[in-house]
């Protein structure tokens, strides 16, 4: 266990409940708290001011940053649920100031040396599942009972409502809003609201964009871009090319680039279509 006495102060130790089990090779900062009956395995590193609740399991190799709260029953760093996994050393890496609620599961990546990565200031609500090789950027909210399959990429500030599944290799764009109980089989464009079974792009996420502090000028530019893609009679490829030529605003550039890559890059699943 890691303690820090570099400043000549009295050596501190993590606050560990007597029923918790900590592997001798685990590295815990002196300010870490570990609740009753939790198990911290080998090759686990936990940063300052992180609180591990009761009945939590963290297996390694896993790195957890500072200021995180991990609630009862969460399981982090177990082997991936992937038949291709051959026992190689892969990782979970979690950033800072995240809330990981009750019974969340976060699996390691499949390939040796690969990473399942969670960024900073995210909220993962109860019973959410993050499968192997997923990447969740920053300030994402994932609601209760969301199941993320492998290799999903979620950009910052996205909002994923409850009780839904997301297909493997899907990308979910920045500041997108996914409605509850939807079936997400293709990429979710940034700044949009997507919902349904089958899912469809319904509109821009106007409330979310306003709450994020986006300017009226940027909102107006995104509205024009959205209308060109989803509400005009312009053929899709031609509309993308027009956006690429005229995208002066960074948000419109991101919108166009996401759609272009989703539509034409190898390995991408293509964007969810607009409503009919």
Curated annotation (Swiss-Prot):
Signal peptide: none annotated. Keywords: Acyltransferase, Cytoplasm, Lipid A biosynthesis, Lipid biosynthesis, Lipid metabolism, Repeat, Transferase. GO terms for biological process: lipid A biosynthetic process. Coiled coil: none annotated. GO terms for molecular function: acyl-[acyl-carrier-protein]-UDP-N-acetylglucosamine O-acyltransferase activity; structural constituent of carboxysome shell. Pathway: Glycolipid biosynthesis; lipid IV(A) biosynthesis; lipid IV(A) from (3R)-3-hydroxytetradecanoyl-[acyl-carrier-protein] and UDP-N-acetyl-alpha-D-glucosamine: step 1/6. CDD domains: LbH_UDP-GlcNAc_AT (cd03351). InterPro entries: Acetyltransf_C (IPR029098), Acetyltransf_C_sf (IPR037157), Hexapep (IPR001451), Lipid_A_LpxA (IPR010137), Trimer_LpxA-like_sf (IPR011004). It comes from the Bacteria. Its EC number is 2.3.1.129. HAMAP family: LpxA. Belongs to the transferase hexapeptide repeat family. LpxA subfamily. Homotrimer. This is Acyl-[acyl-carrier-protein]--UDP-N-acetylglucosamine O-acyltransferase. It comes from Synechocystis sp. (strain ATCC 27184 / PCC 6803 / Kazusa). The lineage of its organism: Bacteria, Bacillati, Cyanobacteriota, Cyanophyceae, Synechococcales.
């Amino acid at each position: 266990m890691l303690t820090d006495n570099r400043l000549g102060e009295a050596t501190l130790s993590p606050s560990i409940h007597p029923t918790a089990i900590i592997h001798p090779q685990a590295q815990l900062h002196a300010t870490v708290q570990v609740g009753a009956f939790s198990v911290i395995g080998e090759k686990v590193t936990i940063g300052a001011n992180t609180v591990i609740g009761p009945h939590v399991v963290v297996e390694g190799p896993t790195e957890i940053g500072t200021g995180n709260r991990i609630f009862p029953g969460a399981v982090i760093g177990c082997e991936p649920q992937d038949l291709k996994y051959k026992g190689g050393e892969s990782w979970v890496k979690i950033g800072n100031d995240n809330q990981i609620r009750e019974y969340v599961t976060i699996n390691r990546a499949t390939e040796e040396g690969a990473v399942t990565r969670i960024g900073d200031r995210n909220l993962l609500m109860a019973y959410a599942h993050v499968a192997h090789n997923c990447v969740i950027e920053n300030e994402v909210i994932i609601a209760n009972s969301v199941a993320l399959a492998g290799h999903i990429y979620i950009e910052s500030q996205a909002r994923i409502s409850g009780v839904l599944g997301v297909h493997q290799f899907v990308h979910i764009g920045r500041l997108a809003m996914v409605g509850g109980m939807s079936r997400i089989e293709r990429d979710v464009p940034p700044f949009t609201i997507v919902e349904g079974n089958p899912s469809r792009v319904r509109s821009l996420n106007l409330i979310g964009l306003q709450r994020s502090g986006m300017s009226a000028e940027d909102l107006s530019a995104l509205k024009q871009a959205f209308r060109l893609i989803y509400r005009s009679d312009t053929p899709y490829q031609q509309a993308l090319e027009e956006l690429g030529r005229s995208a002066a605003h960074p948000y419109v550039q991101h919108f166009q680039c996401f759609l272009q890559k989703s539509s034409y890059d190898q390995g991408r699943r293509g964007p969810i279509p607009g409503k009919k």
